Amino acid sequence: MDRKNAWTTYSKEELDRLEQVNTEYKNCLDAGKTERECVTLAVEKAKAEGYKDIRDIIKNGEKVKAGDKLYAVCMNKTIALFHMGTKPLTEGMNILGAHIDSPRIDVKQNPLYENEEFAYLDTHYYGGIKKYQWVTLPLALHGVIAKKDGTTVQVSIGEKEDDPVFVITDLLIHLASKQMEKKAATVVEGEKLDLLIGSRPIEQDETLEEKEKEAVKANVINLLKQYYDMEEEDFLSAELEIVPAGKARDCGLDRSMVLAYGQDDRVCAFTSLFAMLDVKEVEHTACCILVDKEEIGSVGATGMHSRFFENTVAELVALTEGESDLKVRRALMNSRMLSSDVSAAYDPMYAEVFEKRSSAFFGKGLVFNKFTGARGKSGSNDANAEYLAKIRNAMDAQSVAYQFAELGKVDVGGGGTIAYIMANYGMEVIDSGVAVLSMHAPWEVTSKADVYEAYKGYKAFIEEMR
């Protein structure tokens, strides 16, 4: 079943809208390089569209009615938005779910050290990365430093033109004969992913008898005190993430693609957010949940396994229909969801791992995966045929370009998403997302046409699904 390349179908007006969506998308990628930054950005955009914090509604004893727009935040790393419909919650919601964490390198809690007059930050990588891809790149440092006095300092170094950047070094080719014989998984080891952050000793009084032994480290500590009013001990309560420095860029002479960090899964997260904020009226309550920790198993308080979403739905049921555990269960069971996560784009350079008839292609629209998992569909959510038919109808109703695919050839590999977690409530769930080249690399590639079709598809799902 061949699908048209969406680029061949657009009018001048649609091409203008496509570029508008992609410009906003690139701006969001630049502003949201961590899960915290994504939540901050989502809250700003939601407030601008009239969304209110559910905590304020509860505190003020207000009731919630059709048309109301609410959001709830969990620990500044996960957010759920709700646009209340005319039908009761017990008839189910139309849910868009994506994750906003991406593979990266994290700074450890006791990280700062000096070695032969180089200052480093000790690190531990997060998520599935090819470690060798992260060396010799300009890197930025993002995150927060929580201090004992209760204040939190925001950190972002390496994104402005006049900012310094950081780097993880690699062995020169002239001395790398043994290194080049290693397997790709071990050619760069995890303990060698430490971040080079300085080499200049602190200025010292030459008349002093006892001089600073680790003068480069001392200089870094001095600079941290100067710029962030932090002590070395404050690393203990810091969350600092190392990400590629630089902005999202148009890719290709024809500017048909986007090259950027973190498009898994922010391409689905931001297009879901755009769709959610653009919807005017809904019958079934619309929900957009953007979660943390998917890349490491959706665990913890801010991952999809958390009770945060269930608890928030319980609060909404209480605010609309009165407290009832049974009504909460009905609201969840009767819901419909798009688990919005990226798909592997067919790459002609690595054609041997793909089965073309079941592959996702650039420019052919939103990708649906009936199932994910590995080997014999292990760990998969396998969507029902009846639900797939409804999905097709919703997409066709708004002329969305879409395709169905799997993740590579059978037995070659596999992957998972948050779909199976939400399916545990008994709701209908299918994986849907955007095809990505170089997935999990520091810089990933998407098609602008697919970004636009994802936005259209997510909006159609909210408006058309019954």
Pin down the residues of each PLM region.
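N-terminal hydrophobic/helix-forming segments and targeting peptides
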Residues: 1-466
